[in-house]
């Protein structure tokens, strides 16, 4: 078989659709269950086409097990920002959207753009990310319950109070698990200490950065980290329309949220950062776009 065979994968919670494309308008399509049995059936089905380049969208927990499975088997796999696939689809003026059509679109994107090969993060970093995400969800649930309690009828207040107590205990337990997990792995412990040596970065932010960025080796310059968080300014101008710069928000919303308040704190506490902020204020409007540059 030729080297230009690509496989587009459209991931859903319970299944995934695939499209094997070898050029022109010829596709081989099929769908499989999104579990280990489906992964094995998928690779068995592909055996005649064993030199493929796989491509899927970065869909978080739904797609990660399959991406890891393919990587462990030695296949070439790329994991692409969904925004890039969406823009590619708009350029093709697609009229319909189905899982099969999306898989074909991803295959064509892979063939034309040759995205970089995806490398899985170390298992200890994946576990840390899972813990940090779980902690964030628990905190969101706690805030929701506290808001409900503030307006609840007296007859259900006791139930809300019990749930709040349980959530606080789970939050505390998860925070302790995170600390122990970092202490158990010298690499994580060392990188966390390096992050906290930077003025303005405390334990909470260092843990979040460690979970989402790792040791930073997959980023070649700071601009890539900013883009990964979706904090890069995006300017829209057309003809005589002079648009304002806005955050692209084409990245990790969780990381963006974690960085925003420390950036504002740095503006108030760090003279160098404050001077940079004042210079940017004279050039741009919009505190969020300016704060992104402070990072």
For each feature predicted by the language model, list its residue ranges.
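Gly/Thr-rich phosphate-binding beta-strand-loop-beta motif of the actin/hexokinase/Hsp70
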Residues: 2-21, 106
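Short, glycine/acidic-enriched loop or turn micro-motifs at the edges of active sites
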Residues: 13, 60, 84
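Nucleic-acid-processing active sites and adjacent nucleic-acid-binding tracks
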Residues: 21, 25-53
